[in-house]
Amino acid sequence: MPLNKEMAQLPVQFAVVDLFAGPGGLAEGFSAVSDANGHHPFKVVLSVEKEKAAHSTLLLRTFLRQFAGKFPDEYYAFLKRGAPEPDWAVLYPDQWNQANQDAQLLELGQDAADKLLVGKIDQIRKLYGNNTIVIGGPPCQAYSLVGRARNRGIVGYIPEEDPKHFLYKNYIDILTRLRPAAFIMENVKGMLSSSINDGLIFKKVLSDLRSAGDGYRLVSLTPRVRPQADLLEPTLLPTDFVIRSEDFGLPQARHRVIVVGIRKDVLDKPIAVRLDQLIPRCNMKATVADVLRGMPKLRSGLSREDSIANWGNAVKNAAAIVCKAVSVLPHDERDIFRARVNECAAVATTNPHPLSRAALKPAKAGSSCSESLKKWLLDPNLGVLPNNETRGHMASDLSRYLFAAVYGELVKVSPKASDFPKSLAPEHLNWNSGKFADRFRVQLWDQPSTTITSHISKDGHYFIHPDPEQCRSLTVREAARLQTFPDNYYFKGNRTEQFVQVGNAVPPFLAKQIGDALYALLQLRPNEPKGASGAVRAPHMPRPVIPHINSEAPVGQSSQKAKRKRGRRSERNPSLR
């Protein structure tokens, strides 16, 4: 029949399963991938998250994605007025019910959750065949340098008995059962050096990823910085999986491990292309100014007795403390520093239009922001920016915030602990130990920000706003912009929970680029994967013209130089096999 002939020429639409989804950063990026005709080849059909606040954010965004970018008017009214959230189940019952099916509040590894997931995974495989993608990153607390340092301080802590070290096996179990065409696994850079039983955990992770299901070839998104003589040899090093977000046009120096796996029968031979070459390289790095300039100027709050007048007096007092403290500087530097500090105090106390703590008007991007990033972030339908209220600070910290911000503005670097005058040192026993030299760190206008992490939920000392006149730490929305979440992405929960969600997420703008590259790579398949006859197909997307793959060869082929001893294959959850 003509219809069948036409359908046979159409490329496959891939069903995406998002594990450890958080607020949905990876899913947001993959959902935005489209061809020249506006067709979206990736459809997120299942997201799994265990934290209630993050799941609430994920559920709302899953609901909104069903409106194909044209969100309901009620949503914008909700964001603008700050009124109670509409009852979506009443207004849009079909879309809300579907969202509740797609976004699941579950903890992987729990019997009840695994039983439910088995049924859903089998349904997805039945409908889409092998044309599925798995994305996500197991929680990183056990692998991060900060988390490991914290664990070492716990009496009786035994890494081998910490289940957080083995959460990645839940991911492996899903791969084994679903056998997706490809997967994306994300984690912190500290995973490369984390060890269990005197063995590097990352070696075990890579081994398990390669052998999951029907077997996978692992590929790297990073440019080659050393020669690779034979593409048939698995010569990738662990560091080849580290992605520097600033190299992909993000306004943040975020370095994360991202492993891309392609099922071996999908690309059964190495091909003449590197996956990183499918992502356009950025000639200019995005900066803090690109995304924070153009946002409303806000004042910080005070943790006690906050008011506009009290805040102005607190900044005035902080300025006096800083001016006295910098008397140790050389004469010329001291005068310039004091002049700028006094300007900030004047803004706080004599401004005819006092700063508020929340944004009450739309926001723009910096004039130097790239058009692609600007288009990604901004939404002309927004009346105000959501999640953009400042937090309260101790009055005693304002002098340190003011010093750090003025220092960064004038010296173009963030001050270390040793750069602070002694009179500004906080009452921390470890202040002079050297372990926390960046305890008070200001972000710099003309540089990518430092890594936005969940620690921003604890205090704002490490994320001081670069404008000293605002004398504060970043808001949730400012952190979200540095993480490249669109302005219309609403984070639910209290402010601490919102910060945690933003800090733990994969930047959506980076996820979108990874999705673009992965889809282009999947178009190089010589034939449709076996078992995909029942897969859903999508409108035609032209195959890209691509010049050479930074890939590993099939498991079992290795050079003498690249050979590594592999650990024992661990027992996996049998319910997900």
Annotate each language-model stretch with its function:
Residues L3-A15, A21, G25-L178, K189-K203, ...:
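Core alpha/beta nucleotide-donor-binding catalytic domains of modification enzymes
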Residues G38, A272, K458-Y462:
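Short acidic (Asp/Glu) and glycine-rich catalytic loops that position anionic groups and cofactors
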